[in-house]
Design a protein with these regions (language model features):
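Bacterial N-terminal signal peptides that target proteins for export
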Residues: 1-6
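N-terminal signal peptide c-region/cleavage motif recognized by signal peptidases
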Residues: 13-17
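Short, glycine-/small- and polar/acidic-enriched structural segments
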Residues: 21-168, 174-177, 193, 222
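Short, hydrophobic alpha-helical packing/hinge segments within bilobed ligand-binding/sensory domains
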Residues: 76-78, 86, 95, 183-186, ...
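Periplasmic-binding protein-like
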Residues: 114-129, 206-235, 246-249, 283-288
Length: 301
């Protein structure tokens, strides 16, 4: 009898502990990649995730540890997702493909759950040169040094553009890895001949006067998009939290659509990216289509 009572107390203690658990929600964002705003920055700054998190049923006694970590590109974000340090992540098509491969290599899986923004033609990516450069077109960059964030959507665009010129990317151009925050200084110092990048840098650098765009991603006529991914094991364990994240993302997108000027200013305050450049992407005639719907053309990305 005593053993039965003790067993019952242990079981009750375990059940109480399980129902009162603290659930981690770790989200990797790319704040300066402003077309990811509806999947990260705005959700965080406006407290939208907390608005939709479940507090009934299995989550009645749960508490949440919401963690945010910002990155400047998708590759390092993927590394932390695979290592189990992040549950959600926002990134573009090319790094998203690497994300899937990296998860499978580790014996796990990630799930693509939502588009955040994109262009079926490839707008948003681009190649810029220093403003004082005499280079006027991509064809003049043969034998030159072009930097690009490694494994980014801009990297994919650059490889397509080089192939379209009939060049060997290992012999005819010197492609080096360089994140946007370093590339800006390198362009101003004349340390590189050109830089390929994703949203918003192909517009931001020329806007600030130290670079000039010579190639727009739309010239590659290959779609590009940014979206959100989640660790599959996490999604299976906490599907209601994935739904909460998606609902928060939908509201963030609706707010952007309703008041693009207001939220372009907020994004500028958080990231330092000029509000006018933010509006180029989030305004009603934006460079990209900012919505959460999947388009068949995105499969080509």
């Amino acid at each position: 009898m005593l053993r039965a009572v003790i067993a019952g107390l242990v079981l009750a203690s375990f059940t109480l502990s399980a129902s009162a658990e603290t659930i981690r929600i770790a989200i990797g964002t790319q704040d300066t990649t402003i077309n990811c705003a509806a999947g990260g920055l705005l959700i965080r700054e406006l407290g939208l995730l907390e608005k939709y998190l479940p507090h009934d049923g299995a989550y009645k006694n749960a508490s949440y540890d919401v963690q945010w970590k910002n990155f400047t590109s998708g590759a390092p974000l993927t590394n932390e997702m695979v290592a189990g340090k992040l549950d959600f992540g926002a990134m573009a098509d090319f790094p998203g493909a690497f994300n899937g491969v990296a998860f499978e290599t580790a014996g796990k899986h990630s799930l693509f759950i939502s588009v955040l923004s994109g262009s079926i033609k490839g707008s948003g990516n681009g190649i810029v040169v220093p403003s004082a450069s005499g280079v006027q077109s991509l064809s003049e960059l043969k034998g030159k040094t072009i930097s690009v964030p490694f494994a980014s959507t801009a990297h994919g665009m650059l490889l397509r553009a080089v192939a379209a010129q009939g060049w060997d990317p290992l012999k005819d151009v010197n492609i080096i890895a360089q994140p946007p925050e370093v590339a800006g200084s390198a362009l101003q110092a004349g340390k590189i001949d050109a830089h390929a990048d994703f949203v918003p840098f192909a517009e931001l650098f020329p806007s600030r006067g130290f670079a000039r765009k010579i190639y727009d991603g739309a010239q590659a006529n290959a779609p590009t998009f940014h979206g959100a991914l989640v660790d599959q094991a996490y999604a299976k364990k906490h599907p209601e939290i994935v739904v909460a994240y998606l609902r928060a993302s939908i509201e963030a997108n609706q707010l952007l659509a309703a008041e693009p000027e207001k939220y372009s200013e907020l994004i500028a305050k958080v990231t330092g990216v000029d509000a006018e450049v933010n509006y180029l992407f989030h305004g009603p005639l934006g460079v990209q289509t900012r919505d959460l719907s999947w388009k068949p053309e995105y499969r080509q990305a």
